[in-house]
Amino acid sequence: MRKFIPLLFLICSISFAQLKVGNVDLNFGDIIESKDGNIVKIAGKNNNVIYALARSKKKFFLQTFDASTKNFKNSSLLKFDKLNGSKLQIEDLAIVEGKVFLMLSYYDKKAKTYNFLAKEIQGNEIVNTTNVLSVDVENKKKKGTFVFTPSFDEVNYLVAHVGVNDKKKVLKYSISLLDSNLKSVVKDSYEAVFDKKNRQYFDFSDVQVNEHGDVLIATTESYRDKKKKTNINNITIHAYLASKSYEKQVTSISLSGKRALNCSLMETKDNTLHAIGFYSDLKKNGKAEFTVEGIYDVTFDYTTGTVNKETFNAFTYDVKKQLIGERRAKKGKNLKPFYKNISFVERENGGVIVLSEYLFVVEGKSTGFGPLAITPITYNSNEIIVTALKKDGTLDWSNVIPKEQQVTVSELGFSLGLAGASGAVTVTAGLYFPLTVLGNGPEYLSAIPIYHNGALTVIVNDDPKNIGITTMDDVKKVRNIYKMIPVAFSFDETTGKLSRTDPTEFEKKQIAVRPSTKYRKDSNSYIIYGGSKKGNCLGELILNE
């Protein structure tokens, strides 16, 4: 009997560590022995070591793993003294051209500056600290927001700050593109007069750095023209091209009769840039409807700033029928503005596939006081609208991934408030779920899209009760993360017909993937993180040829 128990445990461990969903393999390493929280960010691989950031309540840890086996190596508490009387807030963990950096921010009360720091890590040690961007702000409450992202090839790292000075009535964004030595390749700032009284709205919508080192920023703006009694709605692309010594190039597109609710950038072949987002119609009085009519796509050559085409694709009857019912769809009713574009995929034909997910967050009533207050937060992550656009931006096909996911977490001393917003200024560029809310459940929501060899596959977590379900009318809501199983939805590239694949074998308490905690290795593979009541594991998701 003493020999039998270890053998049985080994067999269970092997079955727990591997799962197959159609042609998708999910291979996990050993259960992580460390109890230092849950991984909230996978930065990537360097010298056969995977670097990750873990969180437990308000504490953060640097964790390392063997890149070959995905097995746990080490965990170190990230603890820092106050700087100029202010606490340091961990923002990101990134690998830039083989160097590992921990990114932090802090407010300097005396200097009235908001600062972004980069701490270089070698092994498990911090070897130096650099202030990469410092911005003058009004006060701590109006310090604005930092947005940050590595370049497509991970050779550069971009830091941007967006804020409003109410006294001067000025909106300002500042950017700094860094190399691996934390030297600024390009640094710039932009100011505009901003007056809330004129119903002026501004959104810092997206920021990207492509493989050429070009910085591309999308903003949307809406304001009321009292003389013309209408709303002015603009999309503006700010481009800093490496081939032109980062001389700024601005392209503004004015939308007639429509309002852009958001905007994301997607670069495809032949220097074509797609500015894609949701739009709503304008009422007769010039105000925007509180609904989403469809998806727009503005295509242009970003190297010259030439606009090629503006296209507005209303959601089809078949899509709306699944989401709001046949009766309302026949009446031409539109969708509520609770959808967020979570992923953009370049098609082999030069078009773009857009994944738009329903996300509604409810903040409950807090119990307790101050930093000891506990706030219940419910995340509702439901259906995903899949829209395939042609190269010119017109609609090719669309469909709906049926799912209903709900997670409720209790956060200590946390409030959603107006994070990322200042008055009528919003910042939608950035993380889907902030690091401060990951680790307790929201990371199990959403999806992992894989586009390989001209075919789209989307991995989501679902309840075993929904096995075989492909329509919204029949889907059952999944609330328990420990009952979730990974399933795959695939689409016919020509017609958009949806197929569902469920795992043929799974345990009752099967490990579930955390889509918000992943790192893309190739077009068909991700480093992933999963968990169940048995424990958590790092692994790899591979879409087989």
Per-range role (PLM):
Residues 1-24:
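Bacterial Sec-dependent N-terminal signal peptides
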Residues 64-67, 114-125, 171-184, 230-246, ...:
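Beta-propeller blade signature
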Residues 208-212, 216-217, 228-358, 362-369:
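Long, internal scaffold/assembly segments composed of regular secondary structure
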Residues 30-33, 69-111, 132-142, 191-212, ...:
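Blade-loop segments of beta-propeller domains
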Residues 18-37, 74-75, 130-131, 324-333, ...:
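A short helix->beta-strand "capping" segment at the edge of beta-propeller domains
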Residues 36-37, 219, 277, 295, ...:
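Loop/turn-rich, solvent-exposed surfaces of beta-rich toroidal or solenoidal domains
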Residues 250-263, 311-335, 399-447, 483-487, ...:
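Conserved blade-ending motifs and adjacent loop-strand segments that build the rim/top face
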Residues 40-63, 91-110, 154-168, 176, ...:
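Short beta-strand elements that form the blades of beta-propeller/WD-repeat-like
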